[in-house]
């Protein structure tokens, strides 16, 4: 008897945004007190961002991840103790170690000894984490995975640099994947090029208990823009090829929510109508690894994304990293 093909399938989604919603005008007013000039019009014209959410000082990345995870588990209707793999994509972990995934496993009360680890690919992190979990499930090593993107980027922003501090926000998004004979994740593609590591980075490091170098995010915006628009179409086409799908078969595109100009450029290059692109950057800002699962959960819960539809996700981030996945929801 032939052995059936094993897939990983999305059972449920969840997300969480901290309650402190900061509009462009509110942020501009805060910055003006330090002599930093910006405006709602300037931010919207260049990014499409109108607001973002910031976590309170006593709230950690694992706290955000916990709420998103609980909502995804509830939507998936699974026993938390059946989750034998947790992967958290984050660049703003609670600690250098232990991993945020291990902290989350404990907060969820999961005591089954399953694997838990973090993935660090910045804004591509969720694409990396999803593809990794898919591989573990397809090879039979794990059956039920919790995959999360969670960030508190407000902690690493220089609020004297208007070119970066207006872009980012905090939040978390999660999915539960489970082994299935029914097709789910159909194809993924991941890439990196470390020669571009300096165009988007946080150059500080811990040396003998002291932070050496800057602890704030640094970005060469023009270089990031040029590289992003160049690689995103290619990696999307590669993932579609692995999934044996044409772009016109994509029901929904969920790009990393970084900049509306990058997003619309990629959508246009793929030949997709703008109406098929999920956009949350206006309300969330750039939440790095959390942006894709946040947008996914929003569109699932408002009824746009329905069972059986094909969803293409793609992201690009510091490293330089980029990746894409195609799945049937």
UniProtKB/Swiss-Prot annotation:
Pathway(s) this gene product operates in, as recorded in its UniProt entry: Lipid metabolism; fatty acid biosynthesis
Pfam families xrefs: ACP_syn_III, ACP_syn_III_C
GO BP terms: fatty acid biosynthetic process
UniProt enzyme class: transferase
Key word Cytoplasm present: yes
Gene3D superfamilies listed in its UniProt record: 3.40.47.10
Record keywords, A-Z: Acyltransferase, Cytoplasm, Fatty acid biosynthesis, Fatty acid metabolism, Lipid biosynthesis, Lipid metabolism, Multifunctional enzyme, Transferase
Encoding gene, per UniProt annotation: fabH
Protein known as: Beta-ketoacyl-[acyl-carrier-protein] synthase III
Catalytic residues identified in the record: 123, 256, 286
